[in-house]
Amino acid sequence: MGDAEDFCPHLDSIGEVTKEDLILKSKGTCESCGVGGPNLWACLQDGCQSVGCGESYVDHSTLHAQAKKHNLTVNLTTFRVWCYACEKEVFLDPRGPPASQTTSPRLSHRDFPTSAHPLKSVPIAVGDDGESESDEDDIKPRGLTGMKNIGNSCYMNAALQALSNCPPLTQFFLECGGLVRTDKKPALCKSYQKLISELWHKKRPSYVVPSSLYHGIKLINPLFRGYSQQDTQEFLRCLMDQLHEELKEPVPLETQEREEEDRDDQREGERGGTVEEDFLSCDSGGEMGDGEGGGGVGTLSEMELLIREEVGRGLSEKEKLKERKLSYCHRRTSSEQADEDADVDTAMIPEPDNDAYVHCSSRSCSPHPVESISKHSSTPPRSSPLRTSHSYVLKKAQVLSGGKKRSEVRYRSVISDIFDGSILSLVQCLTCDRVSTTIETFQDLSLPIPGKEDLAKLHSTIHQSAVSKAGTCGDSYAAQGWLSFFMDYIRRFVVSCIPSWFWGPMITLEDCLAAFFAADELKGDNMYSCERCKKLRNGVKYCKVLRLPEILCIHLKRFRHEVMYSFKIGSHVSFPLEGLNLRPFLAKECVSRITTYDLLAVICHHGSASSGHYISYCQNVINGQWYEFDDQYVTEVHETVVQNAEAYVLFYRKSSEEAERERQKVVSLAAMKESGLLQFYISREWLNKFNTFAEPGPISNQSFLCSHGGIPPNKYHYIDDLVVILPQSVWEYLYNRFGGGPAVNHLYVCSICQVEIEALAKRRKTEIDTFIKLNKAFQAEEAPSVIYCISMQWFREWEAFVKAKDSDPPGPIDNSKVALTKSSGQVQLKQGADYGQISEETWNYLLNVYGGGPEIAIRQTVAQYQEAEHLHGEQKIEAETRAG
């Protein structure tokens, strides 16, 4: 650190500052806006006590430096010094303190990491999920903050408290706040980030008022406007959908290809790989397809054994029809998400002529209309719209669906990384034995609560046959511990001693899962449209989990809505606090290794279907105790209170002792402080996954790198929010353990991307300026001889591109949806088509740039114009004659 280039001439302006002073300031707030840490900045000018926020908020520290001409500032989280005049990180030289100074050590260059960049750091596997258990946390742990009821907002408060106690999500907003960037209104992610910071701040109040998020959700969905009671599950879906939309980023093509290769290799190793089996692969989209015979998973004989084994295990036919009817009544009324709650059985959609069909999976799409609804969909799972992130597709479906003009872009976000899983559905025609496969992404599982008859069927069939399989529902109780087992035994004994007409049947969460995954007979009004038979046939539907989410959200269907009335199912459903085992419900193709879950939070509803009150029980990640969150009141409760609760929504998190050992290993390596010649940059977001996920997946540095290996120019100004520096030993351990990458030792702005950005900006300006010029000339024409028609769907894509709202240009002009081709070959405009009118010059310009078609021209000859004028004159004379 003694190089001349590292010396800053402004160091003489620093006053007497001790490290204790800075630690004390780090516990304060920004003097301008009042926001708390982390990453506050303190001015080092002699005599100045200013503390301001950084770029993650308003950046009052920079505003202060510019206004007061104070050059040096220190980050109160990392203790790194930045000089605004030199525009670089500087290091304090180790000059000794004056004789009059106290024994407190003065800040020197030894107090700062030796790095060329003022990077903020994420704790590596510190304690439990990065939470420091200080003495203050032992007295009153962080996170125990209530929320004020803003007029029947208990449904929102309960949901927010449950999400707040999901460590992977909360740690992202606390530790990776710089990644929370969006230009989409109402910027709900910013409101949520602020709320989480308030809930988990050391200097937290007893309760907060979530007014910003409350008003933001009302702008998004009219359903939540007003002050009437709403469904907490509806709120959860709306909130997480919006957070995903605001935080989503495209998945790099290289990542998609690597994931596909890895999963293909895994399938080849596990199954031996036949031609039919190769149809299953990983790709973009949440699409679905079907294959002949055993085209989905395994051979046809294996399919038949799996499916026929489950026939007759499901709910009664009467209950199925009722479920389908009720599911329609429970759809959302929002215009943007009108069908998102519907339990759609996508496998019963009438199929096209080929052997595969593609399911609409992007968020802008709506589900296909169907007449039949099955209890097996996970509401539906995420049927409208399904997310594209981390979803699967059948290669056969992709090939036969026809080439797309624009390649489908996969998106991911912290929401999809945490909550998204996938389900494999199989539908078999009982006449020709044809099997179709459907792979869908879900964000939550909406489970039916089986009745007395259905429960008896489940216990007599599924539980008996499951004994011969690897893993049973009963295995999920093995990890609960003796206390939980004993309490559960007592509860079952008490229930058995009381007549069933008084108490009702004993229902477990495993029973609800078994009912959800049980085979569904497709017959009567619910017959299956078989492509091979070309008619409706009896069939059977069977589904399994293909990929488990990091946090499993389970919704119990307690509310039923009939035509004339609604009612609530008040049956108690027992659920395990630890060791929920989903292995019995996994497909052979499942890519998840960890299958056990521990409970994080449960939302309960007290009252009837028309009115009531929501509360939540959550386990604090710091001390492991359970607390009741009832609006602004937070009370510690015993775990037996939680187990006896009337659960409505449950949040389970993957549990893994191996992941804990991995974190401790990394902590040990980091503490050794072995000197290495190289330091490595790693994605801050992935490191947060390592700290909080049971299965973080391969290292992914693409979040801050472009395809050329550099930093995209638009990310360089906040690169310190995206990366963390690791010692060589820690990087090598993580890389050898998880793979991925790429390795990064040097950060630089990508010059290739800079040239591409400038060229793209020039292209956008040229196209929009040319269009405006030609369109003005077109508007000035009084009687154009020809008018060209263009599809507004394509035009809106082009407009979004030239206005920089979409990074990718549109494909070729596509007028197929507004064109009608006659038998003579003449192309005409469809009646009622969504089109726009442009001039011939504008059409030729766009056609030369993008190509496409077909051309739709409306020509007006002079004869036609004169004939129209003559007819108009005759009508005028006739009208005057009648008036006379």
Curated annotation (Swiss-Prot):
| Chain positions recorded as Zn(2+) 3 binding sites | 43, 48, 64, 70
Provide GO CC annotations from the record. centrosome; perinuclear region of cytoplasm
Active site, per annotation: 154, 613
Q: Where is the composition biased (Gly residues)?
A: 286-296
Q: Which domain of life is it from?
A: Eukaryota
Keyword Cytoplasm among record annotations: yes
Give start-end positions of Basic and acidic residues composition bias: 264-274
Keywords for this protein: Cytoplasm, Cytoskeleton, Endocytosis, Hydrolase, Metal-binding, Protease, Repeat, Thiol protease, Ubl conjugation pathway, Zinc, Zinc-finger
Region ranges (Disordered): 95-142, 247-296, 368-388
- What EC number(s) does the entry state? 3.4.19.12
The chain positions of domain DUSP read 657-750, 759-862
Q: Which InterPro entries match?
A: DUSP-like_sf, Papain-like_cys_pep_sf, Pept_C19_DUSP, Peptidase_C19_UCH, Ub_carboxyl-term_hydrolase, USP_CS, USP_dom, Znf_RING/FYVE/PHD
Which Gene3D superfamilies does this entry report, sorted A to Z? Cysteine proteinases, DUSP-like, Zinc/RING finger domain, C3HC4 (zinc finger)
Q: Per the UniProt entry, what is one GO biological process?
A: protein deubiquitination
Domain USP, first and last residues per copy: 145-655
- Function of the protein: Deubiquitinating enzyme involved in beta-2 adrenergic receptor (adrb2) recycling. Acts as a regulator of G-protein coupled receptor (GPCR) signaling by mediating the deubiquitination beta-2 adrenergic receptor (adrb2). Plays a central role in adrb2 recycling and resensitization after prolonged agonist stimulation by constitutively binding adrb2, mediating deubiquitination of adrb2 and inhibiting lysosomal trafficking of adrb2. Mediates deubiquitination of both 'Lys-48'- and 'Lys-63'-linked polyubiquitin chains.
What PANTHER family does the record point to? UBIQUITIN CARBOXYL-TERMINAL HYDROLASE (PTHR21646), UBIQUITIN CARBOXYL-TERMINAL HYDROLASE 20 (PTHR21646:SF13)
**Similarity field:** Belongs to the peptidase C19 family. USP20/USP33 subfamily.
What does the record say about domains? The UBP-type zinc finger binds 3 zinc ions. However, it does not bind ubiquitin, probably because the conserved Arg in position 55 is replaced by a Glu residue.
Q: Name it.
A: Ubiquitin carboxyl-terminal hydrolase 20
* Organism name: Xenopus tropicalis (Western clawed frog)
Which gene produces this protein?
Answer: usp20
